[in-house]
Regions:
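Extracellular leucine-rich repeat
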Residues: 46-48, 81, 100, 123
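Surface-exposed intrinsically disordered loops and tails
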Residues: 27-57
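Structural signature of tandem-repeat unit edges
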Residues: 8-17, 63-76, 86-99, 109-122, ...
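Acidic, glycine/polar-enriched metal-coordinating patches/loops
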Residues: 299, 322
């Protein structure tokens, strides 16, 4: 059941189970809508082949609803349930909800904040896709969310794709893997936090392949990457991502303010795009002669970078081979 208040532009949903997502439908065939005079009429589903009143009501909800309140008892927000609600700025999700379906809130471009209750176990692909003003996604403490994508190695599967205003993202502790496209289009990210069980990109984790393709975590505003202290796979050193043994540099944030970075002693290798697109970076000091660099795109589009290296070092050979500016240090 649902009803809509035209004065407050609020859609209230009650019942048990899920919401109906057939075509543009969001609830069930017994849905009702308040008229201005307080009476109700049955509009069936949101399908465009319904009555004239039904079509008008569907259009009104999609274009004018500003607030959605889902009452306790609803367990699933079905696929595309509220997609393209043009005026939606706020949605309240109760602790009874366990699943948010694919594209559930896609293209809700006025939505700015959302809180995911701890009860949610799965968030489908594209759930918040193209919510271009969504700057805050908060997972309640003790989140049970363990799945956030349906097709982990395909573009378009991320629930937050093209959330261009998203500033921070804290991965729920139960998430182990994401696809390499997960942060695609999240151009305003300043901080990312990974939970205690997070390992890396699905299908690429292993020996030294974790985060070897960071194609989507390329926000030029990203200043720091955080990792839960109890995570056995990853480590954050001053906001820079390493493996737990601190021997492999995985990702240097693109928006880091400092123009100089000294690679810690003990670092044995770097991922294939660890410094890619770090155009603020001017100086990288590598004093370890034995450190081996293999990937040409490691410093791709680092337009101002100079490597400070030891003579007769592996890194010196790499700089020469890849035509990267370098200076010899004692």
């Amino acid at each position: 059941m649902w009803k809509y208040n035209r004065k407050t532009h609020t859609l209230i949903i009650t019942g048990n189970g899920g919401t109906n997502s057939e075509s543009a439908a969001i609830i069930d065939a017994d849905s009702q809508m308040d008229k201005d005079d307080g009476q109700r009429y049955n509009i069936g589903s949101f399908s465009l082949d319904s009555t004239a009143k039904g079509r008008h009501a569907a259009n009104e909800l999609i274009t004018k609803t500003e607030k959605i309140i889902i009452k306790d008892g609803i367990t699933t927000i079905n696929s595309a349930a509220f997609a393209s609600f043009q005026s939606l700025t706020k949605i309240t999700i109760p602790n009874s909800v366990k699943k948010i379906g694919d594209f559930a809130l896609k293209d809700c471009k006025r939505l700015q904040q959302i809180t995911i209750p701890a009860s949610v176990v799965k968030i489908g692909g594209g759930a918040f896709e193209n919510c271009t003003n969504l700057y805050d996604i908060k997972f309640e403490s003790g989140s049970n969310c363990n799945s956030m994508e349906n097709y982990p190695n395909n573009p378009g599967s991320s629930p937050i794709q093209n959330c261009k205003s998203l500033r921070t993202f804290q991965m729920p502790n139960r998430i182990k893997y994401i696809s390499k496209y997960f942060f695609e289009g999240c151009d305003s990210l300043e901080s990312v936090s990974f939970g205690k069980n997070f390992r890396g990109y699905q299908m690429t984790f292993g020996d030294e392949n974790i985060f070897d393709d960071s194609s989507s975590l390329l926000s030029k505003k990203l200043q720091k990457i955080k990792v839960a202290k109890s995570n056995p796979y990853l480590e954050s050193i001053d906001g820079i991502l390493y493996d737990k043994q601190q021997k492999r540099l995985l990702l240097y944030p693109r928006g880091r303010i400092s123009t100089t970075y000294r690679v810690p002693k003990g670092t044995k290798s770097m991922s294939d795009s660890a410094f890619r697109l770090c155009d603020r970076l001017q100086t990288v000091i590598i004093s370890d002669k034995k450190l081996k660099l293999h990937y040409k795109r490691l410093f791709e589009d680092c337009k101002h970078v100079t490597l400070y290296v030891k003579s007769n070092s592996q890194v010196l050979n790499y700089a020469k081979k890849c035509n990267i500016n370098y200076k010899i240090i004692n």
